[in-house]
Amino acid sequence: MTHRRATLCAMASVALVSAAQLGMRWSMSRLPSPVQWLEMQEHAQLDLSALRVVCASITAYALSMLFWLLALRVLPLSRAYSLLSISYALVYTLAATLPFFHETFTVSKTVGVSLIVAGVLTINLRRLPRPSPQDLSHENQRFR
């Protein structure tokens, strides 16, 4: 897998985990405590659309993990891990932008998220050193 494809896998992981967070937040604001779900389902009082979103969010978490594992095969952990921070910025921005979350932008949160994004850019915009041919042959022998 190429570095570019691994970065795309990491970004797919970020998008999926962000969607899962937003889905969980939306669902859980419409559902009772999970320990009450079975009791409420018996009385047909459970919001099934919200429960479906919980299930979809759990699936998104699982897919996110799969993409994350693929990304980690190639990306250095120091760079890959910083990409996860983009999720904080994405969730904050979407939660404050989409009206059904009833979240607001604040100066302190926006400054904090801006610092996170600046940190991710600082870490990831530096070019990675190219591995030498000796490093590549050693790496290939390791997998034989």
UniProtKB/Swiss-Prot annotation:
Residue ranges, Cytoplasmic side: 1-6, 78-80, 126-144
UniProt KW keywords: Cell inner membrane, Cell membrane, Lipid A biosynthesis, Lipid biosynthesis, Lipid metabolism, Lipopolysaccharide biosynthesis, Membrane, Transmembrane, Transmembrane helix, Transport
Molecular function terms from GO: carbohydrate derivative transmembrane transporter activity
Pathway: Bacterial outer membrane biogenesis; lipopolysaccharide biosynthesis
One example of a Gene Ontology biological process annotation: lipopolysaccharide biosynthetic process
Subcellular location, record wording: Cell inner membrane
GO cellular component: plasma membrane
Family membership: Belongs to the ArnF family.
Protein name: Probable 4-amino-4-deoxy-L-arabinose-phosphoundecaprenol flippase subunit ArnF
Organism: Pseudomonas syringae pv. syringae (strain B728a)
Source lineage: Bacteria, Pseudomonadati, Pseudomonadota, Gammaproteobacteria, Pseudomonadales
Gene giving rise to this polypeptide: arnF
